[in-house]
Regions:
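Active-site core of metal-dependent hydrolases
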Residues: 69-139
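Divalent-metal coordination cores built from histidine and acidic residues
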Residues: 1-94
């Protein structure tokens, strides 16, 4: 599973296109996560801005397995329309959503999970790691 977050932050969807085209010349069966947060936070400057509208075409492509790690967890927890719209686009296509919720537990974690975030690889404490399976979320 490839998450082309960095190249898409710099080059936009053209970076995703490049990665997918380059992988066609390998023996690997590469699946991709469409980056969910471009830029990663509203405080960053990047070479592209990918909003829900811009996600509608690439999320339907063969080889796009889901939405890449949703790093703007405060936006999800606080129900920011721009973030929820991205989640809706992915779910309408039957795609999974990868998580990125460092430090969130309890009610905040429940809110994050309610948005149907499927997994989280950011656990750094025993509490965080034990909370996720209890609410049906994988720690990967």
């Amino acid at each position: 599973m490839a998450d082309p977050h960095e190249i898409v932050n710099v080059c936009g969807i053209a970076g995703l296109d490049y990665m997918m085209k380059a992988a066609e010349n390998t023996v690997l069966d590469v699946k991709y996560e469409l980056p969910s947060c471009v830029p990663a936070t509203p405080f960053e400057h990047s070479g592209a801005v990918i909003d829900a509208e811009a996600m509608k075409e690439p999320i339907t492509r063969e080889g796009i397995a889901g939405l890449g790690e949703f790093m703007n967890f405060p936006g999800v927890i606080n129900a920011a329309d721009s973030d929820l719209d991205k989640i809706i686009v992915a779910k309408q296509e039957g795609k999974f959503i990868d998580g990125h919720g460092p430090g969130i537990t309890g009610k905040e974690l429940n809110a994050y999970a309610a948005a149907r975030i499927a997994a989280d690889h950011e656990c750094s404490t025993v509490e965080e790691m034990s909370d996720r399976p209890e609410i049906g979320r994988a720690h990967v």
